[in-house]
Regions:
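A short core secondary-structure module
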Residues: 267-324
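C-terminal substrate/ligand-recognition segments
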Residues: 575, 579-582, 605-621
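Amphipathic, small/basic residue-rich leader segments at the start of a protein or domain
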Residues: 6-14, 26-39, 46-205, 212-236, ...
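Gly/Pro-rich turn-and-neighbor structural signature
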Residues: 120-135, 141-163, 214-263, 273, ...
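Flexible, small-/acidic-enriched active-site or ligand-binding loops
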Residues: 321-347
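Glycine-rich phosphate/cofactor-binding loops in nucleotide/flavin-utilizing enzymes
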Residues: 475-572, 667-758
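A glycine-rich, basic-preceded beta-loop-alpha segment at the flavin cofactor/substrate interface
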Residues: 342-375, 392-409, 550-573, 585-602
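C-terminal helix-coil-helix/basic helical segment that borders enzyme active sites and/or dimer interfaces
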Residues: 425-455, 464-476, 598, 620-653, ...
Length: 812
């Protein structure tokens, strides 16, 4: 009886914490329990004493201010010795940007209503630009010719400039398009599906660069001077940040600007003496307006309090004296314009600082905030484009290509690759749109953008690798027919730029997330830094109650598998519950790690990476549920969403369990694992049955497939590489009844097909029209699986003219 009563009391205590009820309710309930247990039930004296001590001690802490102050002062002193010392640039990076729905994950409180109300819809003007100007640009592009010429054609360059592709995000009052983040993302994605080189060329001026920096931070004079020319393409911008000694650690740049006065003509001008050595700068070889990050120094104190020393952003023209620019890099054989900028003793006026002298020393925060916008849009769109191409072409190829008298998509090994392509593509598109929605709401989602950039580019890598595996020889022979090699070569570039993925996962995502998303940590950090005990006293007790609240949620959800959690009415209701259940566990685990490890988390990168994985996968699961919610009337969308969220739950739980196993305190790690995940790894990788259904779905028309076809470039011309595959697939789908009618057709070889079909016509098994139709379909199938070949002489001359189209078709 005593044990049962104790369990009831424990459930009551957890309910008070879970529901955040008034502590007085717990105190009254505890008093009633202790009286009954002690005087009426006959509780054993030893546990009785322990429970009395715990309850009395807790009440004293809750009610006696002097005790609370003593505890908080003790914690204040301990934290003062353990918090990491941050440099100015680290502090600016951690404080830059806004939070988005990742905060719901971090705090264990997903808001389903808020999620359901998020919308990103193109305006009529934006849709028209995607359908017309962007389509026309894609018509003009030929990735094979671009690779041979190592540049876009003059015609393409002029079209990009004249039609405002460099001014997509510049406000209309300065001659730009003023498009939304969704339009920007859709435009980049469509171009990327045709040419990665062209996509990079368009996306960089609209991402981290002079246009974005001027729009947000420029003076009115700077905006009026530069933005109209940028919008019209009269100026081509670039931004020079990285250096030989400063890549991911961009805060350690050595390029410097010394504040000094110099006599120019009859006037003494306050200016900067700039020396720089930059590399990996996209558009640098052709740029006419150069944005530049330098370490500003003021040894003579000439700034006089207006601005300060530190990283500063400048804007200088190409023809500035002593500036060396024009040399090119060739990143992964992708011939977009990328190169070096050097110079020494370059004098520029102080007015070249973006935003004027007052912004001296504030460049890093400007860069991080603008980077969070670009990382939300450009690179996620590239990753989504790659995985979408993988989805459409690999599904089609698996239906078109036959081996061992069977469509290769029927082999289980191929099905496994297909399902992963489909599920990860669904995740990439869903995550892209959810993060873009934050920018549409004028937020600068630094954490969400880092997660989206990391995982969309990683998913691009996985799906393209899978596509290469399935296509096999069809993918490895380069030429104008090959639609995968360019994506494959471009993947390392997207993985590396705007924050190398290794650094983002191990340092940035959870590092920024803990400061931005936790309701108390940032304020506690500053209270300790400023020696503000009074502020800390108020914060720490709110934090402790928050910690206990999350503990109760994590414990209850873990032991009930989340079955009691409220969730929206949906065919995927159980997935909503699982997401909430895992977010409850994550919130307490993240908080515990911050409390126990403190500043050591900055050094324990692999633990930080696992916490980053947990938050990221749950964020992507949330994105997938939202994406499904908008299309839930279609059964094929459910299959895609089911695979995507199942994958995310598996990876998130795996990351958290791995975190517990590798926790520095083994006993505490074990205890946490038992409390939060008493049944171990209950979330599993998508099963074979789901893989099979999804793979088979990829090889035929479905609602999701039809939707993503609208997001990439298709010309309607069966001579174009991707259209060639799509044309053959649609013929196979539309005439599937004929293949079912002639069941042994798959055993026919191309060379003997006409003869064998003629025999069947003679027997009355086929009509002549049906025979002609089948031959037309098989001719398209033959054409789709051909690869490029080149004459020996053209290879020798490096002209690389494919002769495949001139070769006879065995069905002619």
């Amino acid at each position: 009886m005593a044990t049962l009563l104790f369990l009831v009391y424990l459930a009551f205590t957890l309910t008070v914490l879970y529901r955040r009820l008034n502590p007085l309710i717990w105190e009254i309930g505890s008093a009633i329990y202790l009286l009954i247990a002690t005087f009426f039930v006959g509780m054993h004296w030893l546990p009785g004493i322990l429970i009395w001590l715990v309850v009395i001690g807790t009440v004293i802490v809750l009610r006696v201010d002097a005790v609370r102050d003593a505890i908080s002062d003790f914690l204040f002193a301990r934290l003062g010795n353990s918090i990491p010392k941050l440099s100015k640039t680290e502090e600016e990076a951690l404080n830059a940007g806004d939070t988005w729905l990742e905060k719901d994950i971090f705090t264990g409180s997903p808001d389903w209503e808020r999620l359901a109300n998020i919308s990103t819809v193109l305006t009529a003007e934006e849709q028209a630009f995607v359908d017309n100007e962007t389509q026309t640009l894609c018509d003009m592009l030929d990735e094979w010719k671009i690779s041979q010429a190592s540049d876009l054609s003059d015609e393409v360059w002029n079209y990009i400039k004249e039609n405002g592709f460099f001014g997509l995000v510049i406000p209309k009052e300065y001659g730009g398009k003023g498009f939304s983040a969704r339009a920007h993302s859709d435009i980049v994605m469509k171009i990327a599906s045709r040419s990665g080189v062209a996509a990079v060329t368009v996306m960089v001026p609209n991402s981290l660069g002079p246009g974005e920096l001027l729009t947000h931070y420029g003076t009115e004079e700077q905006k009026a001077q530069y933005l109209p020319n940028l919008a019209k393409g009269l100026d081509i911008p670039c931004f020079a940040l990285t250096e030989p000694g400063a890549g991911s650690d961009a805060t350690s740049i050595q390029s410097e600007a010394i504040v000094l006065k110099k006599k120019v003509g009859d006037k003494e001008i306050l200016g900067l003496n700039v020396s720089l050595n930059k590399r990996w700068i996209t558009l640098a070889p052709v740029a006419t307006l150069i944005g530049l990050a330098v370490n500003l120094k003021d040894p003579q104190g000439l700034l006089k309090g207006e601005g300060e020393e530190g990283i500063t952003c400048l804007l200088i023209p190409r023809d500035t004296e002593n500036l060396e620019i024009g040399n090119r890099h060739l990143p992964a054989s992708q011939p977009f314009m990328n190169g070096t900028i050097r110079g020494k003793d370059i004098f520029v006026p102080i007015s070249t600082i973006i935003g004027g002298q007052k912004n001296a020393g504030h460049g890093w925060q400007m860069l991080v905030e603008c980077l969070s916008i670009g990382r939300s849009i450009s690179l996620p769109a590239l990753g989504a484009a790659s995985s979408t191409i993988a989805y459409l072409t690999t599904g089609a190829f698996s239906r078109i290509r036959r081996q061992f008298n069977t469509e290769i998509g029927q082999f289980e090994g191929v099905e496994e690759k297909l399902a992963e392509i489909a599920g990860l593509n669904y995740l990439a598109n869903a995550t892209r749109l959810l993060t873009v929605a934050a920018v549409n709401e004028h937020k600068k989602p630094s954490v969400a953008s880092a997660m989206t950039k990391y995982f969309n580019t990683e998913f691009g890598r996985i799906t393209i690798n899978n596509a290469m595996d399935v296509h096999a020889g069809r993918a490895v022979v380069v030429g104008p027919r090959n639609y995968l090699t360019s994506c494959y070569l471009g993947i390392p570039v997207s993985i590396t730029v705007e924050g190398a993925n290794i650094m983002s996962r191990n340092l940035l995502i959870f590092g920024q997330g803990s400061m931005a998303c936790h309701p108390f940590v940032r304020d506690e950090f500053y209270a300790v830094s400023r020696d503000d005990k009074m502020a800390f006293r108020q914060l720490i007790w709110k934090h402790i109650y928050y910690f206990m609240h999350n503990f109760a949620k994590g414990l209850c959800s873990g032991w009930t598998a989340g079955l009691l959690i409220n969730a929206p009415r949906s065919a995927l209701k159980r997935e909503y519950q699982r997401l909430a259940r895992l977010s409850h566990a994550y919130a307490w685990l993240a908080d515990l790690s911050l409390i126990y490890l403190g500043g050591d988390l900055k050094r324990k990168e692999r633990l930080s990476a696992r916490l980053a994985d947990g938050m990221s996968y749950l964020y992507m699961a949330m994105a997938s549920l939202r994406y499904y919610q908008q299309n839930e009337e279609h059964e094929d969308q459910k299959l895609h969403a089911k695979w995507a969220v199942t994958y995310c739950f598996y990876q998130a739980q795996k990351a958290m369990l791995s975190f517990c196993r590798n926790f520095p305190s083994k006993p505490l790690g074990f205890l946490v694992r038992v409390l939060l995940f008493p049944f171990g790894q209950t979330m599993h990788y998508p099963g074979d049955r789901l893989d099979h259904h999804l793979a088979q779905l990829m090889m035929r028309n479905n609602h999701y497939r039809d939707g993503i076809k609208q997001s990439i470039y298709l010309s309607g011309d069966a001579k174009q590489p991707i259209d060639k595959m799509e044309h053959a697939l649609q013929l196979l789908i539309n005439h599937g009844d004929l293949y079912r009618k002639i069941k042994d057709l798959k055993r026919f070889k191309f060379d003997a097909l006409k003869e064998q079909l003629a025999i069947k016509v003679g027997k009355g098994e086929l009509t002549q029209q049906e025979m002609d139709t089948l031959i037309a379909v098989e001719k398209a199938r033959w054409d789709a699986i051909q690869v490029d070949e080149f004459s020996f002489e053209s290879m020798k001359k490096k002209s690389f003219a494919s002769v495949t189209d001139m070769l006879p078709n065995p069905l002619d």
